[in-house]
Amino acid sequence: MGCDGRVSGLLRRNLQPTLTYWSVFFSFGLCIAFLGPTLLDLRCQTHSSLPQISWVFFSQQLCLLLGSALGGVFKRTLAQSLWALFTSSLAISLVFAVIPFCRDVKVLASVMALAGLAMGCIDTVANMQLVRMYQKDSAVFLQVLHFFVGFGALLSPLIADPFLSEANCLPANSTANTTSRGHLFHVSRVLGQHHVDAKPWSNQTFPGLTPKDGAGTRVSYAFWIMALINLPVPMAVLMLLSKERLLTCCPQRRPLLLSADELALETQPPEKEDASSLPPKFQSHLGHEDLFSCCQRKNLRGAPYSFFAIHITGALVLFMTDGLTGAYSAFVYSYAVEKPLSVGHKVAGYLPSLFWGFITLGRLLSIPISSRMKPATMVFINVVGVVVTFLVLLIFSYNVVFLFVGTASLGLFLSSTFPSMLAYTEDSLQYKGCATTVLVTGAGVGEMVLQMLVGSIFQAQGSYSFLVCGVIFGCLAFTFYILLLFFHRMHPGLPSVPTQDRSIGMENSECYQR
């Protein structure tokens, strides 16, 4: 039947849970990209200055990181995982519905902190559940999972765009400190075709401001539409809970007689079962605990140093690549409008959309590619492509055409790095480590830290440092990946892996070798 036939067979057997995990990542994508284009309207709504509204970004990113690190608490049983996904996806709809009523920036930051916790929980739990369900065949399904992030991230700005205010709600005399570069991070995320004439404003609060032309009311419609669009996602999780008989209102009713197949399954010794072929609720839950439990597990005491080195180097690779994704999408506009390029505001506003568009396209293309190419090879191509692209951008830093081509190229190379890296690292550790939690946490820390670091360097050294930072961080990612390959080659494998598990790995290696 071949590799493709086995993968399609696995998908048919696990169709409903797979579609459910994909859909919750669509919620993740919706929530991660809406703040940028709506930030100016939200600033008018909350009567806040740019430094004040910046806490909204910080609270979301910080709580996303906390949610990713603590999400492992809900992964010990299938019931806990599904209830966590249901609560998180429902919370995202509630956040969208409540945002129009947040008239104070502190309240808005608190609401976005809740959204960040929900997003972090979704990030960890959905990734881990797919890896647990498909194991060596998980690369294709992880690529689809992260495609839905890009799809949601593309859709939310498109929904918000018709409702954005074209009028400036700030008074004309509030243009002091317009040369301040400290706010480029925030302005770069929101200056698009509807805000091409906007400039950074002063660090003061405007208590008497009211949005003109009903701007606050109009943008409220965008949030309510996104809340409705996201509402089927928690319903899908609820249906999966019902199917698995995990709803408290649906008591389990056992049949009086078992069929021959069910009887054979009941009487089969558990130690001879193939974990990858069992439903998720029967699979082993060891090795995928939260970050703190992973560090305290007694069976890790005898693990070789390469076991820990694989965790660390894998997390460092994603620290760099995911951090570059966040930093580039945040600062590419600011870099374009500065000298020497001096691109017009309207033209530069297309760069973040181009970047996310090619990330989505890359994740779509990587779905068939990942079924025919090893994850290690895909990560190598991605990391080398990132370094080469930044070098080309640095050499041709005066050419606007190369900036657009390089932005599209970076989107393609960065698109599939995370799912490929996750599949490769889990495969290297034979699904017995804490790779999912550690890698998700490392990626979250990188996205938060590198944005702050690049922003500080950009402000202090000028626009040229933006590309220099990209080259440096790309080279660091490549170095950490070479170290990961080295530690993987030295890794002897875990002694606790049963013999049959090893034979399963040899069988799967026909189409998914390490």
Curated annotation (Swiss-Prot):
Keyword Oxidoreductase: no
GO cellular component terms given for this protein: membrane
CDD domains referenced in this protein's UniProt entry, alphabetically: MFS_MFSD4A
Glycan attachment residues as annotated in the record: N177
Alphabetized Gene3D superfamilies for the sequence: MFS general substrate transporter like domains
Record's keyword annotation contains RNA-binding: no
A GO MF label: transmembrane transporter activity
PANTHER family (alphabetical): MAJOR FACILITATOR SUPERFAMILY DOMAIN-CONTAINING PROTEIN 4A, SODIUM-DEPENDENT GLUCOSE TRANSPORTER 1
Stated name of the protein: Major facilitator superfamily domain-containing protein 4A
Organism: Homo sapiens
